[in-house]
């Protein structure tokens, strides 16, 4: 649930509240004290995060009421599905028809979809995914703000510009005061209800320091907090959860163990999976996925990546393209194609129709300025906007020419 408008509590049962949005009923987990039926709240990611005064809620809803339904109608028009056969093969159409009905596809059928190259057929695939997105989620779109607090990293990932092996970039580490000020600006001035705190695998912050930052944000401002600090250790996941973090953004990059070791020297896929499983057990919302376009990666690998994300109970799927960075061992490997990323997004929607929120990554927007719109019309329904202080953004140099680097 990602509506950034107030909703009215219809019922409360233990830690679960049912919230009404202009007639739509959605559930949220409640950790706030003193809520009653009839109260108005903001909820994000399935969590109640703030109670707001009645007059303020009604004022906001009065502004949004007409627009809310207008936007739903526009979205409905854009998601209409017409599987016109044209020059597309009969088998491909049968598979899409089965998907549009919400029936589970076999592995063989999914491979037919992901291996398709015909432009007309792919347009139908993307339309089918968008139809399913609208049918299950309407025009709900998650918008998260991300603060990149440090570009220090002791890992040596061969695809990443902030790898510890890259000696040619300027490193930075935001102070606690800077992080809190950035969070304040994002929440109070820009209205974000969900924040992602991200860094490289940085030993410069202790777990106690990170926990203190999270506690202070939660104490001062209403927001759902995701962490993205790499593998912090299984015990430390609980410390950060107890401090108030409720989401984890941690990609497994690839479901292929051999490929994982090739691009993450000295690392094991099993360790990454263990972190994701432990986080889910603790109650974290999971954002995970893979990197598309790695050397030696097959279509079967990509399908396995989507299936692994589902197995790991992903609340949000994050699949982004490999973009070559001149200061990495993979500098000469070609960047992924935007079309391949759109195929993965569409298949993720088809595979996890009901639950999945699917992210449009900044890396995809870097490949193609039109890709945010195309991805949102291909099954995606989530975006992350950079709210890192402008002076630090160019230094978080995961890949060159990153989109939105200078936008305020």
Language model: regions and residue ranges:
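Structural motif
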Residues: 39-40
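Short, charged beta-turn/beta-strand-edge "cap" motif at the junction between a beta-strand
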Residues: 45-51, 55
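Conserved, mostly hydrophobic/aromatic
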Residues: 102, 129, 157, 250, ...
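Conserved hydrophobic positions within beta-strands
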Residues: 7-9
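Core AdoMet radical
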Residues: 164-180, 186-208, 213-276, 285-292, ...
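Catalytic cores of alpha/beta
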Residues: 233-240, 295-309, 366-377
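N-terminal pre-triad scaffold of radical SAM enzymes
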Residues: 126-166, 171-198
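Auxiliary Fe-S-binding modules of radical SAM enzymes
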Residues: 4-5, 16-27, 35-36, 61, ...
């Amino acid at each position: 649930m990602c509506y950034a408008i107030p909703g009215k509590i219809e019922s409360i049962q233990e830690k679960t509240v049912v919230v009404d949005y202009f007639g739509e009923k959605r559930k949220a987990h409640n950790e706030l004290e003193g809520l009653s039926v009839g109260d108005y709240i903001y909820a994000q990611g399935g969590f109640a995060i703030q109670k707001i005064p009645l007059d303020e809620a009604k004022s906001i809803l009065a502004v949004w009421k007409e627009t809310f339904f207008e936007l739903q109608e526009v979205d409905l028009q854009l998601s209409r599905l017409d599987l016109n056969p044209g020059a597309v093969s009969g088998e491909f159409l049968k598979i899409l028809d089965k998907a549009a009905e919400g029936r589970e596809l076999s592995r063989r059928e999914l491979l037919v979809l992901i291996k398709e190259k015909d432009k007309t057929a792919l347009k139908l695939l993307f339309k089918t995914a968008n139809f399913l997105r609208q049918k299950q989620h309407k025009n709900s779109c998650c918008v998260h703000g991300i603060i990149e607090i440090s570009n220090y990293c002791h890992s040596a990932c061969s695809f990443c510009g902030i790898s510890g092996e890259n000696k040619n970039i300027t490193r930075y580490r935001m102070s606690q005061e800077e992080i809190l000020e950035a969070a304040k600006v994002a929440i109070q001035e820009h209205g974000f209800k969900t924040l992602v705190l991200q860094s490289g695998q940085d030993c410069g912050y202790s777990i106690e320091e990170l926990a203190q930052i999270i506690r202070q944000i939660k104490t001062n401002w209403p927001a759902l907090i995701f962490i993205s600090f790499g593998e912090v250790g299984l015990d430390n996941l609980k410390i950060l959860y107890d401090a108030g973090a409720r989401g984890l953004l941690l990609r497994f990059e690839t479901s292929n163990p051999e490929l994982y070791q090739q691009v993450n020297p000295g690392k094991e896929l099993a360790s990454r999976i263990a972190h994701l499983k432990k986080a889910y057990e603790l109650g974290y919302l999971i954002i995970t996925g893979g990197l598309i376009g790695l050397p030696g990666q097959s279509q079967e690998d990509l399908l396995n990546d989507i299936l692994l994300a589902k197995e790991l109970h992903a609340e949000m799927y994050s699949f982004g393209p490999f973009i070559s960075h001149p200061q990495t061992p993979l500098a000469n490997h070609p960047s992924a194609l935007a079309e391949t990323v759109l195929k993965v997004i569409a298949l993720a929607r088809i595979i996890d129709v009901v639950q999945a929120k699917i992210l449009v990554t900044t890396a995809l927007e870097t490949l193609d300025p039109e890709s945010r719109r195309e991805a949102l019309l291909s099954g995606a329904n989530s975006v992350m906007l950079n709210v890192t202080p402008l002076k630090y953004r160019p230094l978080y140099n995961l890949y060159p020419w990153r989109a939105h680097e200078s936008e305020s």
